[in-house]
Amino acid sequence: RPPPSGRRQAHRPRPTVTRAGVPVVVMGVDVDLEAIANLPKGTEHFLADIHGEYQAFQHVLKNASGNIKRKVNELFGDTLRSTEKRELCTLIYYPEQKLALVKREEKDIKDWYHITIYRLVEVCRDVSSKYTRSKVRKALPVDFSYIIQELLHEHADDKDKTDYISAIISTIISTRRADDFIIAICEVIQRLVIDQLHILGDVYDRGPGAHIVMDTLKAYHTWDITWGNHDVLWMGAYAGNDACICNVIRIALRYANMTTIEDGYGINLIQLATFAMDAYADDPCEEFMPKVSKDNPLDERSKTLTAQMHKAISIMQFKIESQIISRHPEWKMDDRRLLNSIDYKKGTIKINGKEYTMRSCNFPTIDPKNPDKLT
């Protein structure tokens, strides 16, 4: 009701009552936001030029480019030997594999569990210190959320607290959940040590696992990307651009790495292989031999087939690109139409007004009168 005088009283801001899930506003100020603004800035992780090297990428994510090692050194300093700190870091990076090794070698596994869990809690407490309790809680696995929260927020300042923490850890061990708990808290550390991941171009290229990198990113908590030229090339191939498709396959064949195309995306290249073996049956295709790494050796027969496929797709790419350039004279890229600059009888090519002898002039799929025409 209005006051007896008939005048309305001016509205005066009052402190709100704290309610679950509702921001606390005092005199127009959001207390939660003000508090969050005063927290240390979360660690941002920048990675560039992955080029499909998924194993190196996953390892860098797990160790946060050395950030976990640095925190372990800061926390334990001279209280742990260098070997102990290295083993703790390895456990955080690869908990399942390290646990399997420890269980084969450790004589007193219960004692090891107790000491290790205590150390992992210390690391987790440190990496979570930049965040609100709400944000940390959302990062915790459901099975161990309550236990991890209790361990993180209880400090062993007195005997009662020490006994409480020790009892929690002992219960984890006695109920045979130690392995599961260690794996869970190691994954929490990996997640909290990096607040935001920034990918600076080229997930795709010559490496064998660009698709695995993308699957890893899909499962990552928060990231953004600046696409690189190779990424855009793959997008063009996905969109159906013939020149991009040829270029993607050519690069893969150049490095003898068909894993992403064949295994990652299930694209069968049998037709290309059949065509290449027929068209270049008597051609060693030495100029198109793949760049083979020591980790991915090929026998001579496979190298020859890959070189034939490499040459076949390269000629297709040159033809298609030349067709595109001819349709767009405004681009002023006629100098890139190299198939039209070849004298197929003499075996020479003219570039910038100068004539060069070609190392090979075996082009059975090219019509000298119409070099851009696909067969």
Model-derived features with residue positions:
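Feature recognizes metal-dependent phosphohydrolase scaffolds
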Residues: R1-T375
